[in-house]
Amino acid sequence: MNIICFGDSNTYGYDPRGYFGGRYDADSRWVDILAAETGWTVYNMGQNGREIPSAAPAFPDDTDLLIVMLGTNDLLQGCSPTQAAERLARFLSGVYLDRSKVLLIAPPPMTLGEWVASHRLIDDSHTFAKCCQVLAGQLGIRFANAGRWDISLAYDGVHFTEQGHRAFATGLLEELR
């Protein structure tokens, strides 16, 4: 199976512990754990700082599953959950794969930390997850809520810890079985 994981720094595997950031080792990143556990070909299209693009790239026709997890950076930049969901709707409407091949994952909710000083952002991330679920239903695509997977976040309140990546991979594998 060919899987594409399209997301932000939590898909990329950003390690917030170092001064310049960096990347967790492959055996600690959820995308690579998914590949190792399944034997599937998994492409990591995560990018640090990625907000929801205005248009979707042309994903290859031989893609068996497109996993999309976006929206956290949009909320951090001041978008409301509704605005972020509208961006996501526009993006996903431009994905020309069979709807059964698209899995939208709502990011886990943010927690208080260096990047998250306001309870409003935490509330917005919970609301955004609900918006994602509604959107997935409207578009007829698959949906998972990573907020149910007990993802531990780093000191910044945004990025997964290594344990968070493992928990995410476990939750995703259960979702895909």
What are the functions of these language-model segments?
Residues A56-R177:
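Alpha-helical cap/lid subdomain in secreted, periplasmic
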